[in-house]
Amino acid sequence: NPSKFFWKIMETFQARSIKDLPMTYRAVGSSTGQKEFSQQADGDYSTGLNDFGAGDIPMSASRYTGIQNAGREMVHVPFCMGAIALFHSVPADEVGTAGLKLSPCVLAKIFSGQITTWDDASIMADNPDLNVPAGTKIQVGHRRLGSSSTGGTTGYLQAKCPNDWKMVGTGVAMGTGSSITWPTLANFHEVEGSPGMTAHIADKSYAIGYLDAGHGHQRLFSEVMLKNEDAVWLTSKMAMAAVDAYGNNGVAAAGKAAVDAGDIPTDVKADWSQVNLYGKAGANTWPIVLVSYIYLNKDMSGLSADKAGLIKAFVDYVTGTKGQAMLADFSFNMIPAAMNQWTNTWTNVITKPGAVTNFVFEESTDPWNGQAETVISAKRNSYSMWKLGELDLALTSVMGRLTSLESSLNDYGIVPLHGSGTTNPKNWFGKAMVLMEER
C-alpha cells in the first residue's frame, strides 16, 4: 500500500544525489514482502533476499520465530497508519440517501458465506431504505495471495464477531491472517492485489470488497458505513475528516489509543505479531486501522558503509518531518510521536559496520558543502520530477474549478438532461440537442 510513497522518496534521492543511489521497491503485498525479507527460499531463514521489507501488518509469529531460530534478529520500524475500508457497487438509487450500513456481525456472515443476498433480513434491519431486486446476490471479492488488507479485515471480524466468523456449512472458524481459506461459493471471487479488488468493485454489479481506504477514495467508490466502538456509523472518509480534542483524525486517534493503552511494544526486537488497532474507542475513530512497518535486520555489520548509510538515510526521511508530511498525499496518516522510535533504534539497537557513510540533506543553499557526493540536495532535481509537480498543481487547480462549476450549474439556468433507449432516433435527438445548446 505505501509503495507510491516509497517510490517518490527513492526517486527524489536519486534525482538529488551526485552519487549513484540504485534503489528499488517491489510492490508485492505484505505477506510476500515478509517472506522475501525473512527467507531466501521457502523455509530457509539463514538470510533474506532484500535489504529491508515492508508491510501493513507486523511480522507473523511463525516468520519471526523462523528468523530467531536461524540466529538472526529483526526490528520493526513503524512509519505510518492507514484505514482498511469496505466498498460496494450497489446502485446509489437502490441504497438510499442514508448510505449502506453493515455491522461487524453482518459483515462476518457475508464474508463467511452465511449471508448471500443483499435483501437478507439482517442487512435490511439496518438499511430500511435499501431497495434491491429480490434475491440479488452479493458478489464477494477476496484476495488470492496474502495481503495486509485481508489480515486487517479478518482480524477485525474475528475480534468483533467470533461466533459469526465461521465457514458456511461447516461452522469451522474462518481464522485470521494475511491469507485464509475462503468459501468456494459461486458468488465469491478471487482477485489478485489491490488492482484486482479495484476491478472487482468497478466491474461487477452488487459487489463488495475490502481495500485500503486511499485506493477506494481515489476511484470514488461507494463506501460501506461501519459501526465503531462508540456505536457511531461512519465511513473512513468521515473518520479522516473528523478531528478530536487532541487534533487527531479518526485514524490517528486509533494510534493514540493504542499507545495510551500500552498496546505498542517498547522493544523493537520483540514479537509484534499480536499488535493491532481494531475497534479502538472514540466517537470518530475508524475501527480497522493498520500500522505500516519497515522490517530491518538488527545486525548490519556485514553491510558496506554506503549501503548501511543509505538504509539509515532512507528510514530517516520516511520517519522524519519531510516524509511524514508527505503521507497525507497518499491517504495515509503520520504515526504518533510515541510510536516513532527510529532514532533510538538506529543509535542503540542496530549493530552497524565499522564505517557508515553519512548522507546528509541540504534544504537551503550551503555553498561548497552542498556539492559533496554524500549530500542529498533539495537544490538538485530532474526535469521529469519538476514537470510532474507542475502537472499536479495544474490538475489540482482544474479539479477545483470543475467542482466549482458543477456546483453552480443551476445558477446559470443549466439543467442536465439524460436519457437512454432505442437507437432509431439517436441522430434526430442528437441534432435537436445540439440546436438547443446553441440557441
Per-segment meaning from a language model:
Residues 1-439:
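Flexible loop/hinge segments at secondary-structure junctions
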